[in-house]
Amino acid sequence: MPTYQDISRHTSNVILDPEISSEIWAKAIDESAFMQLANRITIPGSGVKVQTITGEPTANWVDETNSKPVSFHSFGNKTITPYKLAVIEPFSDEFRRDKAALYAECVRRLPAAIAKKFDSTIMSNSAPGSGFDVLGTGVSSIAIGGSDVYGAFVSADAAISTADGIMNGIALAPQGKSLVLGAVDNSGHPLFTAGVGSNTVGNILGANVTVAKGIYVSGTPAIVGVAGDFTGVRWGMVESIKMAISDQATLTYNDGSDHTLNLWQMNMFAVKVECEVTFAVMDKGQLVLLTNAVPTTTTTGA
């Protein structure tokens, strides 16, 4: 048996299925929380410098015949730069022929790998380069792991409003969704579910809620979500997501040791999914990280 990490009919835990027709493409937008909540912009491959509004003019009352007040917007600028995100997965020719449905599902899920990496990078403190914003630094946090989950979201809403924002979006990791679904009132009724027969989270304080795996950040405490005013949040893509299939390329990879895989020689082919994307936040004060910590209670003496 070969030692390289290809997917063939002999791959562990793969069950042969009858060949069926299946769609092989699903957009990464459907899998990414930030692609759903933020506003999309189209940018050139070299990036773009966008104008930002940092202050608003102020109106005032005026007595009859008096001079009218003069006030101005204040402006700034922000550089947004895209970076390439890609994944390649090799398959044997026999795998595509004998397990068409499973192959189709693997290809369909490749864009989801792009989406998960995009979200997890944004939630980290390590950007792929300058001009790409991440939330691991410069963003405050609110603990929602206690018994008063509703109160925690009110606190998040207050923090966002203090930064002159309106909470209109919440991205939850599956672990955060579980905390939210477990929130009940004094009668034991769920607070945020769309219904007792539903496994989804309804709007929270009027904010749209989306759930994605890439939001979770392990740690003590773990980050299980982010809430904020997404009006000033942008994600950009150069052109669109691209997918290509090749049976002529030579692949190199490392899984602890170096490997070279000649697709033509091995009767294999590979599927490549790639895109150039970026992420920008105009005001990090209008975003709040949600953790699974239990809020501390401060007591005062008599």
Outline where the language-model segments fall.
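Alpha-helical scaffold segments that mediate packing/assembly in large oligomeric complexes
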Residues: G76-T79, A86-G165, S187, T210, ...
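Short, polar loop/linker segments at the starts of domains and inter-domain junctions
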Residues: V62-K68, E105, D185-S187, P221-G225, ...
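Protruding loop/beta-arch "assembly-hinge" segments enriched in small, turn-prone residues
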Residues: M1-E23, A28, I41, H259-A302
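Short helix/loop capping segments that flank catalytic or ligand/cofactor-binding pockets
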Residues: T58-W61, K99-A100, L179-G182, H189, ...
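Short loop/turn segments at secondary-structure transitions that flank enzyme active sites
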Residues: E56-T58, A86, F95, K116, ...
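Assembly/oligomerization interface modules of large self-assembling protein complexes
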Residues: P2-L85, A112, Q286
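Extended oligomerization regions of viral-like shell subunits
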Residues: P44, S140-F269, C275, T299-A302
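Structured loops at beta-to-helix junctions and adjacent beta-edge loops in soluble globular domains
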Residues: Q51-T54, S92, A173-Q175, A212, ...
